[in-house]
Amino acid sequence: MHTRSIPTAAARPLLALFALAAVSLGAPAGADPIEGTWLGTITAPQGTVADFGLEFHREKGGALAFKMNFPDMFTYAAEFGIPVEDEGGGRYRITPAFDLELLLEGDRLSGTFGKARLPVALARGRAFPPRPAPQRLPPGPAPLWSYDMGAGTWAPPVVAGTMIYLGTKAGLFHAVNAGDGTAVWTWKGANPIDGRAVVGPGTVYVLDTRENLIALDRARGSLRWLAPLHEGIAGAKAPDNPTFNHRSATPLLLDGVVYCGSGDGGLYAVDAATGSVLWRHDAGAPVYSGVGLLGAGTLMFGTMDGSVVLLDRQARRETLRVRTGGGVVTTPVVAGGILIVGSRDYMLYGFNLADGSPAWRFSYWFSWVESTPALVDGLIYVGASDFSRVTAIDPVTGKARWSTPVHGLDWGTPLVTRDSVFTGTVAQNMEGTVIAHVGGIMALDRLTGAPRWQVLAAAAPENGFGGYAGSLALAGDTVIAAGFDGKLIALRAR
């Protein structure tokens, strides 16, 4: 990993070298003063300092353009096609994608990056460092079995007893034998099923993409009931970037009641036996996160306006609401009196549970945090989107124990076993993509984060995705993964 922790007052030799070189590295005669290459660092709230570089040039039409070099984000001399605004007086702005504000003072370029206003300090340089060679890992185990789901999926498999349950983009919901991958039953719905199912004693519950809560007989796969959770609307979609919003809220089953969020901005309580809506709490914004439980009576969930809500399920009263700067699609978790949640403002947050005050922030640079943390033995394990790492973090201090590149979009919850951490990754092949991703499954050493092996997925189709978007599941000593290629597979957990 390229990041490193440096005390605030510590000398930065890299910048000192840039300063010595700057005497002979001024802008060419007649050029805009900002033109050329700038190298330096960017600093995150947790104290992490990473190498960062910008290069500015004029295009044929005269517009000021830039390239970015940000190794920690796997971004190498990337052109994003976003114009640079010259505000005069040495001030420049790159918005809205990066919220990058810069001030040019001689051979120094400083400013802030992103909504969190991360400090950037640059000096003139000659060229970006060379791109590192791709990492080569030992191949992982071959699948023990493979089941054809009939369509790809964004949803994670759920293991209950000897069975695996999951939905697909085609609206198919499968029950599969975990031992040999044979079909037990398949139910066909009218809409895609992108969310995680919850399994009760005799019923499986899942939300489809049109905000219908579906209850299926666990043994036969027949429909028991369907409850629309969209109060007069035909379903709701996340408000921005629909390419990456293939998700539905995860229900919580508790004491005969299914609690589930909806894109209509409500948190619903539904009778698990009949499908009757018992009540709806207006959360004020679409709810695509899962519902977590604190103690015996407090529900926890996130909203697309950046809120994290704690709700007394008996009194139906909010006991705490804290705000982040972006949509929250992760399920909140609590450890050591700290409420932990990821946000689309590129931050993983820790809030003091007692009063909602900030405890810590962990920056993912300009990567959404869509991975719900796995809390195991006093550590949380979290994936990332473009940051493409699994990170083990102390939930009380917010300090990383280790952080390992996995080279793909990592949206699911890491699967943690006694010795290993397994994660699925996604490759995207969308027009305009500047960050290369790899789809597959990786195994890491739980203690150190060192990579053990990698199973590569088929390449992503044009304007599509490849790999494994949902969390992995554990069935005995096998890892279960469901892919965009329509295959459900089992791998030996080694």
Located regions from the model:
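Central antiparallel beta-sheet cores of small beta-barrel/beta-sandwich binding domains
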Residues: D32-E105, F113-G114, L166, V382, ...
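Edge beta-strand at a domain terminus
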Residues: A77-G88, G106-R108, T112-L137, L488
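Extracytoplasmic beta-rich repeat domains
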Residues: R131-V158, V184-G200, L223-L254, W279-G295, ...
